[in-house]
Amino acid sequence: MFLTNLTLTNYRNYEYETLNFGEGVNVILGENAQGKTNMMEAIYVLAMAKSHRTSNDKDLIRWNEEYAKIEGRAEKRSGSLTLELLISKKGKKARCNHIEQQRLSQYVGHLNVVMFAPEDLNLVKGSPQVRRRFVDMEIGQVSPVYIHDLSQYQKLLQQRNHYLKMMQARERSDEAVLDVLTEQLVLLAAKITLRRRQFLSLLEQWAMPIHYEISRGAEQLCIRYEPSVDVSEKAELSRIVEAYSETFAAMREREVQRGTTLVGPHRDDIAFFVNGKNVQTFGSQGQQRTTALAVKLAELELIFSELGDYPILLLDDVLSELDDFRQTHLLDAIRKKVQTFVTTTSIDGIKHDIIQEAAIYRVHSGSVTAPS
């Protein structure tokens, strides 16, 4: 798939901009703080209906304006696609092929993207929350049902935590209410756990050979899912439900004392091992970067295997973070098969011929000069 057109209205520092893109590599060139990353973010938001940089949608709206709008046209193997996302202080409205989507979970997945930015190097060395967010966003692109289940889980989790806090303060003591909330939470938690495990198993299958090649045959990558309940790697949904039910029962007294839910997908983690050692704890910076790069390239292949279309790749100021060998491997891997957007302050340090042949868009103060 590839994005043929992007139109921004009142988005960040863009008042109005409309651009056409080629199927290959598109370089967004400019000094810092001119709007390069804002454009990359806009493409990401168009696809995912949320930003990777902020959780506050108001940040996306241009100063002193009431709304921001992102519009895009794309070509997929299944046909043409038009997308529109309106962001106001009241919320978001999304349209796909001019049809308003009742829920954002219906909208996400029509356009697929993989973002690789400097902060994605924290995928390995960052907090468990970073890794959970990564997994959830990627599964959501290929499974709208997962987005719905995750949203329902988060709402129920808030309700359960609120009730636990009231029980902690002795404002409520009805165990039956907690039983109902727990029972509803258990099934959703089990579904999320099962889907995460399946996704990470597939991701590992794609990432292992990529990592082996980038490390020039010196390293073997293993991705381990660490759920908050003790279940075997081959456990079916019914067994995962049992495990959650048993664990919640055992933890109830502690949860009431703490006033919060101590078990569930919101406490999962993912660990990356290279040659049997945890990369987060024992890996060098080079190993951490190789692992992050291998995972990002594996995402491309996994989405293609699931959907039959390669996603759009967004490389936001990340090439400068990679050495020449990793740069070359990344750019060779995407050649002629993945539409790619690259932001950089200069192309001089990028020697690969794929960049030299790219379409160059120059950004200055929220205005873009397209290639002639």
Swiss-Prot record:
UniProt subcellular location: Cytoplasm
Keyword Magnesium: no
Main location: cytoplasm
A GO term, aspect molecular function: single-stranded DNA binding
Pfam families: SMC_N
This protein's name: DNA replication and repair protein RecF
CDD domains (alphabetical): ABC_RecF
Gene Ontology annotations for the cellular component aspect, listed alphabetically: cytoplasm
Family, per entry: Belongs to the RecF family.
Binding-site positions, ATP: G30, E31, N32, A33, Q34, G35, K36, T37
Any one Gene Ontology BP term: DNA replication
Iron-sulfur keyword on record: no
PANTHER family in the cross-refs: DNA REPLICATION AND REPAIR PROTEIN RECF (PTHR32182:SF0)
UniProt keywords, alphabetically: ATP-binding, Cytoplasm, DNA damage, DNA repair, DNA replication, DNA-binding, Nucleotide-binding, SOS response
General function of this protein: The RecF protein is involved in DNA metabolism; it is required for DNA replication and normal SOS inducibility. RecF binds preferentially to single-stranded, linear DNA. It also seems to bind ATP.
InterPro entries: DNA-binding_RecF (IPR001238), DNA-binding_RecF_CS (IPR018078), P-loop_NTPase (IPR027417), RecF/RecN/SMC_N (IPR003395), RecF_2 (IPR042174)
